[in-house]
Regions:
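Acidic/His- and Gly-rich active-site-bordering loop/insert found
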Residues: 1-44, 53-56, 60-69
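Histidine/acidic-residue-rich, glycine-tolerant segments that coordinate divalent metal ions
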Residues: 25-27, 31-43, 49-50, 67-194, ...
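Hydrophobic/aromatic beta-strand patches that form the interior of the parallel beta-sheet core
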Residues: 16, 103-105, 290-292
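Non-cysteine beta-strand/loop elements that form the S-adenosyl-L-methionine
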Residues: 19, 132-134, 291-296
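Active-site beta-loop-alpha junctions enriched in small/polar residues
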Residues: 21-23, 80, 110, 238-240, ...
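Divalent metal-coordination and catalytic microenvironments
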Residues: 3, 18, 48, 75, ...
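Metal-dependent amide/peptide-bond hydrolase catalytic core
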Residues: 154-337
Length: 337
């Protein structure tokens, strides 16, 4: 979903994209409030309803004040952020063209900081990710006669342990990185050695070099260990979300705009990149972009639960703050020399 708002002043050729993700999660909403999900097994457990509300609020105010700016605001509502990353498809289908988008602005609700504050960072904000699947193929046999088998469970266990050396022994310790194995499936009974085991995991890195190295080494380690233990191995590694990297100049502009709304003391510095991924990174890979975190925690109201939890909630008082900062940034960008 996309919409354009054009200013009534002389067109300066500037176009700013403002993005909100709109999808929900496959969770049962256990909140006790008027806006809890009415659809069984589906809820807004990551604040995307807040993002959408903020963008709609920005749209209303910007549209009602077109006389104060020239240029164009492109409203971009992104589906499938939690799954395949809708931003990638939107870009492929031309969301950043006709008219060409010069910069993109976005935010995310942040339940670890209080309403009335924001958190922003120059440079890398979120990690890149590469999900992987490893299928180890051996030869099954009776559990009493392991010499008659090529045991894929033993092979898989060695692969899993060896993968941890990528981060601990091959990545610069100054660069955060993670290789996580989250699933392993194989076997049907305690006395049967299976033919096959499937391993599922994900790589998370902060630099292009670490990403390329980790992807290469997962494949080399898995195939090498399997071969040395007489097994076969198939490795599939997906090219998923890139690192989200903020534009330094836009971060400075955002800080100044946010300080006008909430005060300098409430504009917090994000000290370290987040290991989670964010599909806004696709936009930031194409054009200069800025992405920040909007505080939505309120201890007095009991709004303290983490994202992707069935009790996740946002303090609604954070919404007008997000709208005000967004409008301040947009108008400043479109009216500055």
């Amino acid at each position: 979903v996309c919409a354009l708002i054009k200013g009534n002043k002389a067109d300066n050729g500037r176009v700013i994209g403002v993005r909100a993700d709109i999808d929900a999660l496959p969770l049962e909403d256990k909140k006790k409030c008027s806006y809890a999900s009415k659809i069984k097994g589906k809820m807004h457990g990551c604040g995307h309803d807040g993002h959408t509300s903020i963008l709609l609020g920005i749209a209303k105010l910007i549209n009602n004040n077109r006389d104060i700016f020239g240029g164009t605001v492109k409203l971009m509502f992104e589906p499938a952020e939690e799954t395949t990353g809708g931003a990638k498809v939107m870009i492929e289908e031309g969301i950043l063209k006709n008219p060409h988008v010069d910069v993109v602005y976005g935010l995310h609700m942040e339940e670890t900081i209080d309403t009335g504050t924001i958190m922003v960072k120059k440079g890398t904000v979120n990690a890149a990710s590469n999900p992987f699947k490893i299928v180890v193929k051996g030869e099954g046999a009776h559990g009493a006669y392991p010499a008659a088998a090529v045991d894929p469970i033993v092979v898989s266990s060695q692969i899993i342990m060896a993968l941890q050396t990528i981060v601990s022994r091959e990545i610069n310790p100054s660069n955060p990185a993670v290789v996580t194995v989250g699933s392993i499936h194989g076997g049907t009974a305690s006395n049967i050695i299976p033919d096959e085991v499937e391993i599922g995991g994900i790589i998370r890195t902060m630099t292009k070099e670490d990403r390329e190295h980790s992807v290469k080494r997962v494949k080399e380690i898995a195939e090498g260990i399997a071969r040395s233990l007489r097994a076969e191995c198939q490795v599939e590694i997906e090219e998923s979300y890139p690192c989200l990297i903020n534009n330094d100049e836009l971060v400075e502009r955002l800080r100044q705009n946010a300080e006008k709304v909430i005060g300098k003391e409430n504009v917090l510095e994000q000290k370290n990149p987040k290991m989670g991924v964010e599909s806004f990174a696709y936009f930031a890979s194409e054009v200069p972009s800025v992405f920040y975190f909007l505080g939505c925690r309120n201890v007095e109201k009991g709004i303290i639960h983490p994202a992707h939890s069935s009790l996740f909630d946002i303090d609604e008082e954070s919404l007008p703050i997000g709208i005000a900062i967004g409008c301040e940034f947009i108008v400043d960008y479109l009216t500055s020399c």
